[in-house]
């Protein structure tokens, strides 16, 4: 195989081109050389190069003032599609590489929107705990009410503390009987109030007209209004009943002698509770 080069140099008037073609022994040609002449513009410089190829031979043709080289056109045709195919493959690779990333970003954004809607749903409803599973992802939304575990140990500790005073209270009653021993002497020292007790049902009583707290004296530290055995007149003040932070004086509705004081000083009384037993 051999290569051929063609160079054309023309003066201002005209130029001549010599084209020599070489062929192999396999393809015999009768006329081995031809002469082609045509006019060119001022001072053109043209150079035609053809590289050796195993499958084709350089051929120069001149038809209607046009020169074409088969080898160079073939080379252009071969180079063009190969570069286009390479670009297409690269673009496919880039698109295939970027498509999964876009898919994952879209799925993540959709999942986040679902999470926000679920959080709003839990806040607006009486839902304590919500669990969501999607593909390989698991989401759990819990309120503070669903986490009572840290408070449970504190409650057990508080339950143990009241138990200790209870034992002390149980141990205290044995000392009370010793102090209760002198108590029997007090009932013995007050025999007079005991006789009228059987006749209480038949004697008239002064009842409380309202609910409140019963007080025998007008103020703390002062002597009581009446005592057992005192004679009272109708309309005389016997005690005070505090109701709604008001001190209400209770008067006797008849004249007589105070036989018994039923209510206890400083204790609450209800409506129509007997306060005194007054014998006419």
Curated annotation (Swiss-Prot):
Coiled-coil annotation: which residues? none
Ranges of biased composition (kind: Pro residues): 189-198
- PROSITE patterns xrefs: BIOTIN, BIOTINYL_LIPOYL
- Predominantly, its location class is plastid
UniProt cross-references to InterPro entries, sorted A to Z? 2-oxoacid_dehydrogenase, AcCoA_biotinCC, Biotin_BS, Biotin_lipoyl, Single_hybrid_motif
Where in this chain does the record put each Biotinyl-binding domain?
Answer: 203-279
Regions of compositional bias (Low complexity) in chain numbering: 177-188
Q: Where in the cell is it found?
A: Plastid, Chloroplast
Protein name, per record? Biotin carboxyl carrier protein of acetyl-CoA carboxylase 1, chloroplastic
Source organism (scientific name)? Arabidopsis thaliana
Which gene underlies this protein? Answer: BCCP1
């Amino acid at each position: 195989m051999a290569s051929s080069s063609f160079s054309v140099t023309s003066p201002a008037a005209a130029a001549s081109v010599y084209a020599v073609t070489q062929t192999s022994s396999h393809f015999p040609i009768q006329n081995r050389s031809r002469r082609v002449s045509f006019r060119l513009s001022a001072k053109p410089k043209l150079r035609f190069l053809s590289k050796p190829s195993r499958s084709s031979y350089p051929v120069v043709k001149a038809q209607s003032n046009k020169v074409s080289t088969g080898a160079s056109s073939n080379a252009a045709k071969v180079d063009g599609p190969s570069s286009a195919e390479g670009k297409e493959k690269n673009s496919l690779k880039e698109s295939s590489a970027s498509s999964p990333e876009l898919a994952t970003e879209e799925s993540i954004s959709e999942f986040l929107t679902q999470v926000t809607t679920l959080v709003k749903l839990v806040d607006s409803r009486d839902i304590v705990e919500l669990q969501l599973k999607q593909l390989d992802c698991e989401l759990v939304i819990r309120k503070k009410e669903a986490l009572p575990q840290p408070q449970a140990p504190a409650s057990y500790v508080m339950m143990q503390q009241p138990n200790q005073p209870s034992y002390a209270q149980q141990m205290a009653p044995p000392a009370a009987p010793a102090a209760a021993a002198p108590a029997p002497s007090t009932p013995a020292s007050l025999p007079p109030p005991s006789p009228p007790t059987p006749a209480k049902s038949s004697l008239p009583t002064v009842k409380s007209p309202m609910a409140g707290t019963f007080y025998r004296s007008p103020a703390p530290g002062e002597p009581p209004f009446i005592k057992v055995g005192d004679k009272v007149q109708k309309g005389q003040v016997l005690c005070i009943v505090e109701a709604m932070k008001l001190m209400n004086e209770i008067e006797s509705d008849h004249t007589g002698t105070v036989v018994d004081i039923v209510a206890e000083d400083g204790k609450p009384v209800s409506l129509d509770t007997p306060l005194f037993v007054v014998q006419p």
